[in-house]
Swiss-Prot record:
<feature type="active site" description="Cysteine persulfide intermediate">
    <location>
        <position position="328"/>
    </location>
</feature>
<feature type="binding site">
    <location>
        <position position="183"/>
    </location>
    <ligand>
        <name>pyridoxal 5'-phosphate</name>
    </ligand>
</feature>
<comment type="pathway">
    <text>Cofactor biosynthesis; iron-sulfur cluster biosynthesis.</text>
</comment>
<feature type="binding site">
    <location>
        <position position="155"/>
    </location>
    <ligand>
        <name>pyridoxal 5'-phosphate</name>
    </ligand>
</feature>
<feature type="binding site" description="via persulfide group">
    <location>
        <position position="328"/>
    </location>
    <ligand>
        <name>[2Fe-2S] cluster</name>
    </ligand>
</feature>
<dbReference type="Pfam" id="PF00266">
    <property type="entry name" value="Aminotran_5"/>
</dbReference>
<dbReference type="InterPro" id="IPR015421">
    <property type="entry name" value="PyrdxlP-dep_Trfase_major"/>
</dbReference>
<dbReference type="InterPro" id="IPR000192">
    <property type="entry name" value="Aminotrans_V_dom"/>
</dbReference>
<dbReference type="InterPro" id="IPR015424">
    <property type="entry name" value="PyrdxlP-dep_Trfase"/>
</dbReference>
<keyword id="KW-0001">2Fe-2S</keyword>
<dbReference type="InterPro" id="IPR016454">
    <property type="entry name" value="Cysteine_dSase"/>
</dbReference>
<dbReference type="InterPro" id="IPR015422">
    <property type="entry name" value="PyrdxlP-dep_Trfase_small"/>
</dbReference>
<dbReference type="GO" id="GO:0030170">
    <property type="term" value="F:pyridoxal phosphate binding"/>
</dbReference>
<dbReference type="GO" id="GO:0046872">
    <property type="term" value="F:metal ion binding"/>
</dbReference>
<dbReference type="GO" id="GO:1990221">
    <property type="term" value="C:L-cysteine desulfurase complex"/>
</dbReference>
<feature type="modified residue" description="N6-(pyridoxal phosphate)lysine">
    <location>
        <position position="206"/>
    </location>
</feature>
<keyword id="KW-0808">Transferase</keyword>
């Protein structure tokens, strides 16, 4: 077993060796290096064919028509293109958008930008387990609501939203439904021929493909229109201009092909490892599970250890690559906005750790992790005056802290 152990698969994944090998064939002079938009010679035709194959592989994983897949630079761009693109195109119908407080920053900040441009956004608070209350969603829908954006799997706590029912609710009212599926694609079954989802964002690097490539699903029947955000040569049916990065597209396609083949066995294996990890640490005193194991993705476990500072725990766990309560916001000392939206106090939010498992995680690594976490928590609490007071029965909420 090699240290450190990588348990941050929700932040990014290593490229699968099969994917890397495939990508190498699309870079150099002796490979297929052409521009897929070059129609006058075979270098272009071969590149275009490679892109078509990858587009099919992505469509097959999610039950879409390949013509509904638009390549972008990643899920952040896909979220921007979907939300701004739909809002701008349909603004004559209304200017009201609904999303949730626990979305990824790529959705929240895009909505904030639209607010500055005169749109109105309702941010729904989830229930304490992270699941959106569908009655609250229904109550928020208005005649001028044009778009709902609610993710499939949350990147911090792993809870799975009921996108099928939300889709039905939106379709019944003629509201466009966008889903950020970055964390779920290739991990949970998605069938867009059955789901009433109009726009869906995908990424390459969360599923063992390369970074810098993603896609947006744009429904054809009923036809959804979006306004392009990137202008130029009119690539991707006018929705996203820019020369297609063939090697990255091929890599994403291969990653999605592998995911389709291995998803079922892989998810059962990861669920087993995640449960093994939780069972190994759940009897530690004052440990809290954030999210919902039953309605959770099989590969994410978010846990708070009371009376332990998250930053010091990360330092103690230096043999583990994990993230503290804020994945994309790990650099800031603010507690995770996702955990705060669940109604959690700052102390617990600060002491949270996200373990995310993946294709190369082993049972041996999980057992090492359990042992290390148990020892580290014990050691840090031995040093903590707060833990000592808690053990003596002092109500820490009643203490007046002096501000120096």
């Amino acid at each position: 077993m090699k240290l450190p152990i990588y348990l941050d698969y929700s932040a990014t994944t290593p490229v699968d060796p099969r994917v890397a090998e495939k990508m190498m064939q699309f870079l150099t002079l002796d490979g297929t290096f052409g521009n897929p938009a070059s129609r006058s010679h075979r270098f272009g035709w071969q590149a275009e064919e490679a892109v078509d194959i990858a587009r099919n592989q992505i469509a097959e994983l999610v039950g879409a028509d390949p013509r509904e897949i638009v390549f972008t630079s990643g899920a952040t761009e896909s979220d921007n293109l979907a939300i701004k693109g739909a809002a701008n195109f349909y603004q004559k119908k209304g200017k009201h958008i609904i999303t949730s407080k626990t979305e990824h920053k790529a959705v929240l900040d895009t909505c904030r930008q639209l607010e500055r441009e005169g749109f109105e956004v309702t941010y729904l608070a989830p229930q304490s387990n992270g699941i959106i209350d569908l009655k609250a969603l229904e109550a928020a829908m208005r005649d001028d609501t044009i778009l709902v954006s609610i993710m499939h799997v949350n990147n911090e706590i792993g809870v799975v939203q009921d996108i099928a029912t939300i889709g039905e609710m939106c379709r019944a009212r003629g509201i466009i439904y966008h889903v950020d599926a970055t964390q779920s694609v290739g991990k949970l079954p998605i069938d867009l021929s059955q789901l009433k989802v109009d726009l869906m964002s995908f990424s390459g690097h969360k599923i063992y493909g390369p970074k810098g490539i993603g896609a947006l699903y744009v429904r054809r029947k009923p036809r959804i229109r979006i306004e392009a955000q990137m202008h130029g040569g009119g690539h991707e049916r006018g929705m996203r201009s820019g020369t297609l990065p063939v090697h990255q597209i091929v890599g994403m396609g291969e990653a999605y092909r592998i995911a389709k083949e291995e998803m079922e066995t892989e998810m059962a294996r990861l669920r087993g490892l995640r449960n093994r990890l939780w069972n190994g640490i759940k009897d530690i005193e004052e440990v809290y599970l954030n999210g919902d194991l039953e309605q959770g993705a099989p590969n994410i476990l978010n846990v708070s250890f009371n009376y332990v500072e998250g930053e010091s725990l990360i330092m103690a766990l230096k043999d583990l690559a994990v993230s503290s309560g804020s994945a994309c916001t790990s650099a800031s000392l603010e507690p995770s906005y996702v955990l705060r939206a669940l109604g959690m106090n700052d102390e617990l939010a600060h002491s949270s750790i996200r373990f995310s498992l993946g294709r190369f995680t082993t049972e041996e690594e999980i057992d090492y992790t359990i042992d290390l976490v148990r020892k580290s928590i014990g050691r840090l609490r031995d040093l903590s005056p707060l833990w000592e007071m808690y053990k003596q029965g002092v109500d820490l909420n009643s203490i007046e802290w002096a501000h120096h």
